[in-house]
């Protein structure tokens, strides 16, 4: 096998660090997705496995453009159910779906140069008026769910 045809390990854009005081730090740095296609997305399944693999308080540093709101909602719920204290620090940007995850922190901190971007949900839809009405109803439900975060 040549060097070019060798599979490369997926590069992950999140990393858990075990701190000396027993707490953990998560660096969440990349797009939020339901499934991993390129190996760089934060997915709920992977997140849950790593969240439950330790204990103690956690600090989450977020720098993410957002992504799949349903995946973000799952991660938000996991963090809300977590037994330890959850602190969020926005490092750069917590945009779109990442802003939902940021709201799971008991304390949320931002520097003066970081950004939190919240917007109305959006989608692409094709079909007749019935399909468009379904899409509108779905967007309204998503909007209400993220407002509740």
Language-model features, listed with the residues they occupy:
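Terminal-region recognition feature
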Residues: 1-149
């Amino acid at each position: 096998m040549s060097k070019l045809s060798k599979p490369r390990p997926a590069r992950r854009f999140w990393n858990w660090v075990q701190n000396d005081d027993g707490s953990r730090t998560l660096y969440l740095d990349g797009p939020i997705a339901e499934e991993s296609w390129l190996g760089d997305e934060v997915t709920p399944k992977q997140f849950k496995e790593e969240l439950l693999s330790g204990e103690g308080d956690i600090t989450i540093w977020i720098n993410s453009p957002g992504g799949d709101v349903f995946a973000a909602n799952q991660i938000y719920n996991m963090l809300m159910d977590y037994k330890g204290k959850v602190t969020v620090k926005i490092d750069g940007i917590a945009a779109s779906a990442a802003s939902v995850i940021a709201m799971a922190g008991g304390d949320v901190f931002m520097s003066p140069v970081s950004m939190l971007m919240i917007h109305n949900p959006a989608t692409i839809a094709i079909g007749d008026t019935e399909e468009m009405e379904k899409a509108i109803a779905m967007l309204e439900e998503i909007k209400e769910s993220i407002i509740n975060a």
